[in-house]
Amino acid sequence: MSITPSLSRRTVMSLLAAGLSPAFAQFRVEVSGVGLTQLPIAIASFRGEVQAPQKIGNIVRADLERSGMFRPVDTAGIVADENTRPDLAIWRQKGADAMVTGSVSPLADGRFDVRLRLWDIVRGQDLGGQSYTVAQADLRLSAHRISDFVYEKLTGEKGIFSTRIAYVTKTAQRFNLWVADSDGEGAQSALTSPEPIISPSWSPNGSQLAYVSFESRKPVIYAHDVATGKRRLLANFRGSNSAPAWSPDGKQLVATLSRDGGSQIYALGLSGGDPKRLTQSSSIDTEPAYSPDGRYIYFVSDRGGAPQIYRMSPGGGNPERVTFTGGYNISPAISPDGRWLAYVSRVGGAFKLHVMELASGTATPITDTTADESPSFAPNSRLIVYATQQQGREALMTTTLDGKIKARLSGAGGDIREPDWGPFQR
């Protein structure tokens, strides 16, 4: 049985068929939902931020709320710098367990000095601070680094706010590949083309993006250097070249090629050479994704009659089926901690994001939208970014793994699709 075009939710449709420039539009983050356990935190307006082009306190507040781990306490009208010790009694009465204060000061050379202090309101302790000297263009990045500092101090886990996402937009007859902050802001165009761009995939060190371009009137795989804008051809074999995914060590990719007839999964060396075929079926095998430890390659196949998710060893061999709930499951993504599988399942006529605990095999739908696609985990495994349609608009969303906290990153105009969350910055 062949896989229908909707298998891909765009990415797999290919089976059937310079440097960065500033974004033309910014995103707006809209957070909804209530988590079961959230730390109440007060984030005051930073002293001096009204004269700065970015409101640091607002960015930090949005970051922490979007994570699902924190509940912001009302600080309307409160301005406090890093040297101001909070009145513990007042903030305890307001329900805060922690507080962030800080300042933004312009320097003579045009840069800004950004400082913060984190306070434990319950214990009355100074939990430390940070300072950054940044160019105006990097003020948002400094805010995300503050969020990372606060998140790690209070949860013991590394924050993901200074990481990046890649995604594709379509406006009129133009396709754009974008690189943006984890909240969707600060987008920079990596590639513009009149032909489709699909399947962006970050390299493990965050320096490159593999993607599929149709500029040659067929799907071809490239690797794009994010810093320089230079790119190189990785796969232009006969037929379709699609769905690239990096190995955890960054030394090779796996991809779907139809060079030998049917769509099968191959390993591609970065320096060229003949690709190694990993699957040997008469069905469509596609959408490969490595497990973070490199022990498995997960992929989608219709070898059982309908699309399901399987896994195999990285050298190929006999695959084992992973998904058994639902008759149509696609778009596998494995969490960096190796515990979770995110995928899209067709439920009736709707495509809904599911999360499976791999140890138990228990799968749960976590969205109430009906056109979900392209899930990708944050590098700390706590959030998933995905594309969907909401209120008649294409949008990017993030969600916690339980689906309790969602944030919509909604841009102005155009379809927004194919997100991929980059690794921690090194």
Swiss-Prot record:
Signal peptide (residue range): 1-25
Main localization category: periplasm
GO biological process: cell division; protein import
Compartment(s): Periplasm
InterPro entries: 6-blade_b-propeller_TolB-like, PD40, Tol-Pal_TolB, TolB_N
Residue spans crossing the bilayer: none
One GO CC annotation: periplasmic space
Name assigned to this protein: Tol-Pal system protein TolB
Described function: Part of the Tol-Pal system, which plays a role in outer membrane invagination during cell division and is important for maintaining outer membrane integrity.
Organism annotation: Polaromonas sp. (strain JS666 / ATCC BAA-500)
Claim: Cell division is one of the keywords in the record: yes
Top-level taxon: Bacteria
Keywords: Cell cycle, Cell division, Periplasm, Signal
KW Cell cycle (keyword) present: yes
Assembly notes: The Tol-Pal system is composed of five core proteins: the inner membrane proteins TolA, TolQ and TolR, the periplasmic protein TolB and the outer membrane protein Pal. They form a network linking the inner and outer membranes and the peptidoglycan layer.
Family under the similarity heading: Belongs to the TolB family.
